[in-house]
């Protein structure tokens, strides 16, 4: 079996494992199948790329386990006309998955190094509907607003008001709510007027959402 055949087999088994974990949206499963997670992990960890585990990345951050990526993506209820804002680019894996389901993905991170690496991966994969920026995630990107969907991939005590304002009426926002280093609630919000109506999805642990742009990395 060649390396490419081995990887295809590994990815097929990976998708089956996600189905067993309750992911039913075929479009989401197809998006995860199309994105080679191995490209987004450290070369020393590639043997774990298709395991359902969170993995460390640069700048002291982590990339979520695939089942959580799938669940959060499924909860957004995307269609091919949506514009999505992702807060917390990280490795770029989540944005790459979103790119196969939405018209436009805007992703941002406070770490220049992470954004640069993610942009390179997007280019390698030929993803032309993803735009990555360095910036303060608590403030979003008002110049590109409004957004149909917003995904926050870092824990926050409450959804920053700037992000609420950038979400379209009836739009969906997914975020882990709670204190750092504690169990948080992954919540799905729907914008009703100027407010958000929330429903809990599951318990999670995410790194904290930090204001500002990193000075050194």
UniProtKB/Swiss-Prot annotation:
Catalytic residues as annotated in Swiss-Prot or TrEMBL: 64
Xref: Pfam families: PCMT (PF01135)
Catalytic activity, as annotated: [protein]-L-isoaspartate + S-adenosyl-L-methionine = [protein]-L-isoaspartate alpha-methyl ester + S-adenosyl-L-homocysteine
Any GO molecular function: protein-L-isoaspartate (D-aspartate) O-methyltransferase activity
Subcellular location: Cytoplasm
Domain of life where this protein originates: Bacteria
Keyword Ribonucleoprotein listed: no
GO biological process: methylation; protein modification process; protein repair
Function: Catalyzes the methyl esterification of L-isoaspartyl residues in peptides and proteins that result from spontaneous decomposition of normal L-aspartyl and L-asparaginyl residues. It plays a role in the repair and/or degradation of damaged proteins.
UniProt-listed NCBIfam families: pimt, PRK00312.1
Similarity section: Belongs to the methyltransferase superfamily. L-isoaspartyl/D-aspartyl protein methyltransferase family.
PANTHER family: PROTEIN-L-ISOASPARTATE O-METHYLTRANSFERASE, PROTEIN-L-ISOASPARTATE(D-ASPARTATE) O-METHYLTRANSFERASE
Name listed for the protein in its UniProt record: Protein-L-isoaspartate O-methyltransferase
Organism: Azorhizobium caulinodans (strain ATCC 43989 / DSM 5975 / JCM 20966 / LMG 6465 / NBRC 14845 / NCIMB 13405 / ORS 571)
């Amino acid at each position: 079996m060649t390396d490419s055949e081995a990887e295809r087999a590994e990815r097929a088994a990976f998708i089956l494992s996600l189905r067993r974990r309750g992911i039913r949206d075929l479009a989401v499963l197809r998006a995860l199948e199309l994105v080679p997670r191995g490209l987004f992990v450290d070369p020393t960890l590639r043997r774990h790329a298709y395991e359902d585990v969170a993995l460390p990345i640069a700048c002291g951050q982590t990339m979520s386990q695939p089942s959580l990526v799938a669940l959060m993506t499924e909860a957004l209820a995307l269609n091919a006309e949506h514009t999505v804002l992702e807060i917390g680019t990280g490795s770029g894996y989540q944005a790459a998955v979103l790119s196969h389901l939405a018209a436009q993905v805007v992703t941002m991170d406070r770490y220049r190094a992470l954004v640069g690496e993610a942009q390179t991966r997007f280019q390698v994969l030929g993803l032309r509907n993803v735009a990555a920026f360095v910036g303060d995630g608590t403030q979003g990107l008002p110049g590109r607003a409004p957004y149909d969907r917003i995904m926050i991939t870092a824990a926050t005590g409450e959804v920053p008001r700037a992000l609420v304002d950038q979400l379209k009426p009836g739009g969906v926002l997914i975020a882990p709510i709670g204190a750092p280093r504690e169990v948080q609630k992954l919540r799905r919000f729907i914008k009703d007027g100027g407010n958000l109506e929330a429903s809990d999805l599951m318990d999670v642990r995410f790194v904290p959402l930090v204001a500002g742009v990193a000075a050194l990395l």
